[in-house]
Structures are given as structure tokens and as C-alpha cells.
């Protein structure tokens, strides 16, 4: 078993790094974490009560850390200002500026321990932003390896993320997991959508490959305008029936507000054409499940945990609302496990 002295995890969330270290069978003597979300911290306190909280990442110069012992530092720095789904302000807003804070902290770690390894993560973004982050990371930290990994390789969820490291990372093997593999049985009716809600939805008839529809305005980009199935590598799936009884045809989709010809907006249930879910977000209506051809329901919190390859009930200490949010903000753990195994061969 590999062993490291201490790990520092920035923007810790629900302790994805520590969980991944455990799953990768890498022993760590001490974990420092920075996180200001009280609900995410509640999950950490339940599972890793001995981990050391540091509070606000912007106050890092006040932290009481033995920097010389930090062998690994991770940072999934906030994505809102870099994502195509956001305002794309980059480091021109407060959250985007945390990229520079991240570089300062990692640089400090490397100054005290040049052999330390780092891992930075963020969303798939426009090329200019990706190049900007890569360039300034190299200027600050030295040679950087960058890779884009889709969580669809290790889970039933499409989730493209960039990872920047100071060690080589390969693509994980495709586990071939699809939506039906992670669904809870029997179906809990409390997650069904009401008949009144379903009656308002309009489905697209002919999916175009993996994308079943769009309301994209000219010059606009981003996932919120495109409609994918939650059953393949990002879209509407017909799951293999033998894998899980009862034998439902399962589709994934999302509820989207769409413009009608008269300028009004309707809520439409849009199916994706594959066997993967859409990317988990903090918005519950971004992922729904269709089964028995007539019933529609949301993904359950446990199903969202499975999509993120987190153990069942990992977030059970939270309300369902906070579970959806924390999981949508989190990492796909098996991707991080793969990256750690590349770091500590």
C-alpha cells in the first residue's frame, strides 16, 4: 500500500479526495481541508472526523500547516466563471479569482516540498479559457500535464472535466456502465413526477444522434440549450433488459423551458439518445428518468451518488435538496481514483 504524509484539499466539498485515496488504497497520515459550505462540511465531519478543517481558502496565509509534509494537494476550483453554462467572466469575477489563490497555495506547497504532487480540476470550457489556465499554471508551477476525461468511462454519467497535474495521467478504461445499472429498485413513487407536471411536457420525436433537441440562440453555446439522453455516453438510452429486473425500457432526460412559436415558454421533457445521464448539476430538473414508457421521475439521491461513484448514503446526513447540490458540485470519485493510481504507481 502506498503512503503519503499529508494531503491538502482545497474546495473540499464532500471529501472527494480523501474518499478517492481510500478507494485507491493510498494511506494518508493527515488530511487538511478547506471548505466554507456548512453542509458539505457536515458530510466530511461524519466520515472523516479526524481531518483538519482550515476554513476559507482566501485566508490561507493564516493556516497552521506543516507545509514540508504536504505530499499531495488538490483543487477543484470554482467553475461558474469558466463554464460555458455561466457568464464566462473567467478571472474577472470573485469566484474566478480563486484560480490565482489556488496557484499561490500550490506554489507554496512545491516550494516547501518540490516532490509534492498536485491535481487541479475544472469543467470543459472554451479553448481560450483552457489555454489561459494551462499557460498561467505552467508559468507558476512548471511543467503541467493536462487531460480531458469524461466520467462516462467509469460511470453512467457524462461529465467532461479537465485535470491539470504535474504527473502523467492516462485515460481510464471504459467500464461500460449505463443508467439501468445504477437505478434503485423497486422504484420509490415519491420521486415520480405528478400527472399535472407530465401533461405540460413535450418530447422531441427524432433525436439527432446523441442530441435530441436544442433552443440554441445564434452565437450562444452551452449545455443548457442542448438536450441529451441520460442513457448512453450522454443521452436517451434503451437499457439492456437483462441487467436488472423488472425489465423496463429506461430513458433519461431533462426538463427544459423552451420557446414556442408565439414567444411563450413551455416546460418540455427532453430525452437524450444514449445510455448515460446528463451531467449532474445542482438543479434537480436537469436529470429525470422515464420508465414503463408512461412514468417519469427524478433521479434519487442514492442514484446521484452512484453516478458520482460515491458509496450509497454517503450524503444521507443532509436533506435531499442539499444531497443533490453537494453531489452536483462534486467529483466523480472513480476518475480521481484512476488519477491517483497514475500518480502513485
Language-model features and meaning:
Residues 1-345:
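Conserved active-site and SAM-binding loop architecture
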Amino acid at each position: 500500500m502506498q503512503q503519503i504524509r499529508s494531503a491538502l484539499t482545497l474546495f473540499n466539498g464532500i471529501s472527494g479526495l480523501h474518499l478517492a485515496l481510500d478507494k485507491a488504497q493510498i494511506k494518508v497520515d493527515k488530511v487538511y481541508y478547506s471548505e466554507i459550505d456548512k453542509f458539505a462540511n457536515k458530510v466530511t465531519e461524519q466520515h472523516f472526523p479526524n481531518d483538519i478543517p482550515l476554513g476559507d481558502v482566501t485566508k490561507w496565509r493564516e493556516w497552521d500547516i506543516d507545509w514540508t509534509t504536504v505530499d499531495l494537494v488538490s483543487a477543484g476550483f470554482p467553475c461558474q466563471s469558466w463554464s460555458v453554462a455561466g457568464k464566462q467572466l473567467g478571472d474577472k469575477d470573485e469566484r474566478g479569482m480563486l484560480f490565482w489563490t489556488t496557484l499561490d497555495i500550490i506554489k507554496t506547497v512545491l516550494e516547501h516540498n518540490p516532490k509534492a504532487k498536485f491535481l487541479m480540476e475544472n469543467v470543459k470550457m472554451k479553448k481560450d479559457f483552457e489555454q489561459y489556465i494551462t499557460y498561467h499554471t505552467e508559468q507558476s508551477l512548471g511543467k503541467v500535464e493536462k487531460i480531458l476525461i469524461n466520467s462516462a468511462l467509469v460511470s453512467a454519467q457524462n461529465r467532461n472535466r479537465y485535470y491539470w497535474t504535474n504527473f502523467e495521467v492516462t485515460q481510464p478504461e471504459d467500464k461500460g456502465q449505463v443508467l439501468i445499472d445504477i437505478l434503485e429498485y423497486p422504484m420509490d413513487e415519491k420521486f415520480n413526477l405528478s400527472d399535472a407536471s407530465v401533461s405540460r411536457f413535450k418530447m422531441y420525436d427524432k433525436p439527432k444522434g446523441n442530441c435530441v433537441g436544442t433552443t440554441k440562440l445564434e452565437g450562444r453555446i452551452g449545455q443548457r440549450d442542448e438536450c441529451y439522453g441520460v442513457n448512453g455516453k450522454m443521452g436517451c438510452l434503451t437499457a439492456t433488459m437483462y441487467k436488472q429486473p423488472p425489465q423496463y425500457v429506461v430513458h433519461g432526460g431533462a426538463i427544459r423551458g423552451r420557446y414556442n412559436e408565439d414567444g411563450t415558454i413551455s416546460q418540455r421533457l427532453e430525452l437524450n439518445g444514449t445510455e448515460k445521464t446528463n451531467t449532474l448539476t445542482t438543479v434537480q430538473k436537469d436529470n429525470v428518468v422515464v420508465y414503463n414508457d408512461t412514468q417519469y421521475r427524478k433521479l434519487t439521491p442514492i442514484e446521484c451518488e452512484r453516478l458520482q461513484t460515491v458509496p450509497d448514503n454517503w450524503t444521507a446526513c443532509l436533506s435531499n435538496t442539499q444531497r443533490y447540490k453537494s453531489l452536483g458540485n462534486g467529483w466523480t470519485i472513480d476518475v480521481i481514483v484512476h488519477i491517483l493510481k497514475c500518480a502513485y504507481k
